Amino acid sequence: MGCRQSSEEKEAARRSRRIDRHLRSESQRQRREIKLLLLGTSNSGKSTIVKQMKIIHSGGFNLEACKEYKPLIIYNAIDSLTRIIRALAALRIDFHNPDRAYDAVQLFALTGPAESKGEITPELLGVMRRLWADPGAQACFSRSSEYHLEDNAAYYLNDLERIAAADYIPTVEDILRSRDMTTGIVENKFTFKELTFKMVDVGGQRSERKKWIHCFEGVTAIIFCVELSGYDLKLYEDNQTSRMAESLRLFDSICNNNWFINTSLILFLNKKDLLAEKIRRIPLTICFPEYKGQNTYEEAAVYIQRQFEDLNRNKETKEIYSHFTCATDTSNIQFVFDAVTDVIIQNNLKYIGLC
């Protein structure tokens, strides 16, 4: 009896040691795993950041992966032009050449088959080139803040010959500029500085935000993306609400949420290149009537940054780490993410009492 009990005790002790080792190993693994949550409104550049992580830390896009983006890029180009043509009537803009009205009819007749096949036929290419070159269409494009048009429109429409070629294979820049609405939750894992990162991208549309709560558990850091150039634009969802106002409200709710008291908060003030171009034409007062500064990139960017940082109601205990970014610029994102990682590591060490 005593011998049997001793044997059972030894086995229990062995099991206990195995469990302890497993728990220590799991604890160390969790310390080495960084869960990054990408948040922000639609069109703020979150999905482009995910693509950049794949390029910088996961080997990029091989030939087959590049080919898979061709139908999306074709769709983006066609969709951009059809949006411009539809907006002509609403903005009361006429074609410079009346013959383009027939091309517009042809555009809508030919786009369905082209989108389903993922290719632009020579006939459709001719139609698209003539429409895009028309001064009336260009005037409509210059007023794109009055309707919904993606940032990549001019990039693709200025290069129709290349993307319509039968042997077209998307470049990395083509892929970075492609736009596909994120629905659901997209996870991307990669290793950097001996840490495993799990980056979680959640759709930014209002209808998608109810899913965010499912991602909050165990978050190490939040990267909140802001569309700097969206200060004169309205939401897709209601065509009434300012995109910048929506972004500020959303950031306020995240920054001051009790879930994230010990979570590093990083602010990506994105699309700085588009802000620099737009601010010369459209004043910041269209969004911030109280703004008294010059309509220069430097002053406007700092003013917008301050609007977000001032929402932090816990400045003594919570710091916001702000960076101006261009999500389509790989070198910029690589530099910024390196700095972000150092901040996350330092804050993690403080949190577990090792720093």
Curated annotation (Swiss-Prot):
InterPro entries: Gprotein_alpha_I, Gprotein_alpha_su, GproteinA_insert, P-loop_NTPase. The modification ADP-ribosylarginine is found at residue 179. GTP binds at residues 40-47, 176-182, 201-205, 270-273, 327. A lipid is attached at residue 2 (N-myristoyl glycine). One of its GO terms (molecular function) is G-protein beta/gamma-subunit complex binding. Residues 1-26 are annotated as: Disordered. Keywords: ADP-ribosylation, GTP-binding, Lipoprotein, Magnesium, Membrane, Metal-binding, Myristate, Nucleotide-binding, Palmitate, Transducer. One of its GO terms (biological process) is adenylate cyclase-modulating G protein-coupled receptor signaling pathway. Coiled coil: none annotated. Its main location: membrane. Residues 32-355 form the G-alpha domain. Residues 35-48 are annotated as: G1 motif. It holds the Pfam family G-alpha. Residues 197-206 are annotated as: G3 motif. The keyword Lipoprotein applies. G-proteins are composed of 3 units; alpha, beta and gamma. The alpha chain contains the guanine nucleotide binding site. Interacts with ADGRB2. This is Guanine nucleotide-binding protein G(z) subunit alpha.
